[in-house]
Regions:
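Active-site nucleophile and cofactor-binding loops and adjacent substrate-binding regions
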Residues: 23-24, 48-54, 81-83, 290, ...
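Short glycine/serine- and small hydrophobic-enriched flexible loop segments
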Residues: 37, 62-66, 251-256
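Short Gly/Ser/Thr- and Asp/Glu-enriched loop/turn motifs at secondary-structure junctions
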Residues: 43-44, 290-296, 329-334
């Protein structure tokens, strides 16, 4: 109700020009400041709101490219990123003319720091770290990766679109069980970070925060043009028109919940995720790769089991019970994003998982579906 009422009040406002709608400028500034404080940003940290995680990533890549060209004269810029990094970084490289240097992950599914060190060089514009990475839900070694970026004067962006509104509260609630190594703007060498309020911040789609360590770094994100007949045109992201609706709704939700509210939601979420992981690992033939501590995890076949479960068959059996889990791979897996909304149904899900495993074994092996984790092709 809080989000809906705020959205109704800002149904027609446009954040393209915050001089015309000053309340949207104040909303953006307050959300960026609140998030910067949460993510240990220095006093000079600054940011903008975007429409979501992908746009935040696109803007971070563009800013890194512009800085590398302006300050170091880089003409053939590269992004160094792990194979686990979000596909939006490859989309950004495609759109903005950067090359990608993809490095492997280690046995624990985090970025291989030695491989990052080998890949970083004079053409590096950006090193990407994830907190957590999406496929297996583990946090990259951000401090080491940021140090390597800083050694060549490159940006280091932390993709915390999934974790920005979870990891800080997880550490507060139980640092031993749910804590992470340093990963945010408190890490030297991290130049930008993104966190989606419309994911585990529980705001409506779509609003994300993209923060830079300083206003000086943020300016590389902004496009300014006045050599036409319409006056000065300046935009901080890829959109022109920006709906005020999601911005206002996000502001209302953050103000309503506050840190205490988010702590309660995160505790409930992570207790539920722990139950799910334990339930999956208790099934002979299934595995949870890596050591995810938070709200993301993948279900894969256990290669050491006498009778591994066929994951595509398991996915179809769960779908028949009205549980939609994104398919991913390699390796073949089913992806889960746990939120506070899953708390009331975790017992039902675990019971259905047991039944679905039996059905999958009876059905036998089927080939992976030829579709994406999240894709719209028509």
């Amino acid at each position: 109700q809080v989000a809906e009422e705020a959205a109704r009040l800002f149904l027609h406002e446009n954040a393209l020009n915050t001089a015309a709608f000053p309340s949207l400028g104040e909303i953006q500034a307050e959300l960026c400041a609140w998030t910067a404080d949460l993510l240990h940003g220095p006093p000079e940290a600054a940011g903008f709101l975007t429409s979501g995680g992908t746009e935040s990533i696109l803007c971070a890549v563009e800013a890194a490219r512009e800085r590398a060209a302006a300050e170091r004269g880089v003409v053939d810029p590269e992004i160094v990123l792990a194979r686990s990094a979000h596909a939006a970084f490859h989309k950004a490289a495609h759109l903005f003319g950067l090359r990608t240097r993809v490095v492997p992950v280690t046995d624990d599914w985090t970025a291989d720091v030695d491989a990052v060190a080998d890949a970083v060089g004079p053409s590096t514009a950006l090193v990407v770290a994830s907190a957590p990475q999406y496929p297996q839900g583990v946090v990259d070694p951000v401090a080491e990766m940021a140090g390597l970026a800083d050694s060549v004067g490159a940006n280091c962006h932390v993709d915390a679109c999934m974790g920005g509104f979870v990891l800080p509260f997880a550490t507060d609630e139980d640092p031993d069980a749910w804590g992470s190594p340093p990963w945010d703007l408190g890490v030297d060498g991290v130049t930008s970070i993104s966190a989606d309020i419309h994911k585990l911040g529980y705001a409506p789609k779509g609003v994300s925060v993209l923060l830079h360590r300083s206003r000086e770094l943020r300016r590389y994100q902004t496009f300014v043009f006045d050599d036409w007949l319409g006056g000065r045109y300046a935009t901080p992201n890829l959109q022109g028109t920006r709906s005020g609706l999601p911005m206002a709704a996000a502001w209302a939700v953050v103000r309503h919940l506050g840190r205490d509210g988010y702590r309660r939601l995160v505790r409930a979420t992570l207790e539920t995720a722990d139950r799910i992981r334990a339930g999956v690992r208790a099934v002979d033939g299934l595995s949870v790769p890596g050591d995810p501590r938070h709200h993301l995890l993948s279900i894969t076949a256990d290669p050491a089991a006498d009778e591994p479960v066929n994951i595509p068959a398991l996915g179809e059996a769960l779908a028949a019970r009205h549980w939609h889990l994104d398919r991913q791979g390699p390796p073949d897996g089913l992806h889960l994003t746990v939120s506070a909304g899953n708390v009331p149904t975790v017992n039902e899900w675990l019971a259905d998982l047991s039944d679905a495993v039996v059905e999958a074994r009876e059905r036998g092996n089927i080939d992976p579906a030829d579709d994406g984790s999240y894709a719209t092709l028509e």
